Amino acid sequence: MARLFGTEIPNEKRIEASLPYIYGIGRSTSKRILEQAGINPDIRTGQLTDEQLTKIVQVITTDGILIEGDLRREKQSILKRLTSINCYRGQRHRRGLPVRGQRTRTNARTRKGKKKTVGAQAKKK
């Protein structure tokens, strides 16, 4: 298996489908990287030469694409900033509620967690 930026990418898949194994690179970014590097997207990852791998790494670093740890750190710092300035989005993140204006009276179960029943008690005899 080829190793790029600390991530093992499968040898048997096409390089176009293997690059998205790296956190921060999707299908469209993968196509753009291969186009800039001048590599055929249909080549299997195991068939790539060392020069082609270094060309891919060079394109990713020169384009300023955030990947792996840098991207995770960036996302975390953005969330930390939102919560520290106490804006609406930060408050929603802190409370674990939907951030982008979705309704919460019904639905939003994924974000809110398991349903907690309140107020329904059986009568004592």
Curated annotation (Swiss-Prot):
Keywords: Ribonucleoprotein, Ribosomal protein, RNA-binding, rRNA-binding, tRNA-binding
GO biological process annotation, one example: translation
SUPFAM superfamilies named in the record: S13-like H2TH domain (SSF46946)
Record region (Disordered): 92-125
Family matches, as Pfam families: Ribosomal_S13 (PF00416)
Family annotation (PROSITE patterns): RIBOSOMAL_S13_1, RIBOSOMAL_S13_2
A molecular function GO annotation: structural constituent of ribosome
InterPro entries to which the protein is assigned, alphabetical: Rbsml_uS13_C, Ribosomal_uS13, Ribosomal_uS13-like_H2TH, Ribosomal_uS13_bac-type, Ribosomal_uS13_CS
GO CC term (a single one): cytosol
PANTHER family reported for this sequence: 30S RIBOSOMAL PROTEIN S13/40S RIBOSOMAL PROTEIN S18 (PTHR10871), SMALL RIBOSOMAL SUBUNIT PROTEIN US13M (PTHR10871:SF1)
Physiological role: Located at the top of the head of the 30S subunit, it contacts several helices of the 16S rRNA. In the 70S ribosome it contacts the 23S rRNA (bridge B1a) and protein L5 of the 50S subunit (bridge B1b), connecting the 2 subunits; these bridges are implicated in subunit movement. Contacts the tRNAs in the A and P-sites.
Record note on quaternary structure: Part of the 30S ribosomal subunit. Forms a loose heterodimer with protein S19. Forms two bridges to the 50S subunit in the 70S ribosome.
Family membership: Belongs to the universal ribosomal protein uS13 family.
NCBIfam families: uS13_bact
Protein name: Small ribosomal subunit protein uS13
Native species: Akkermansia muciniphila (strain ATCC BAA-835 / DSM 22959 / JCM 33894 / BCRC 81048 / CCUG 64013 / CIP 107961 / Muc)
Lineage: Bacteria, Pseudomonadati, Verrucomicrobiota, Verrucomicrobiia, Verrucomicrobiales
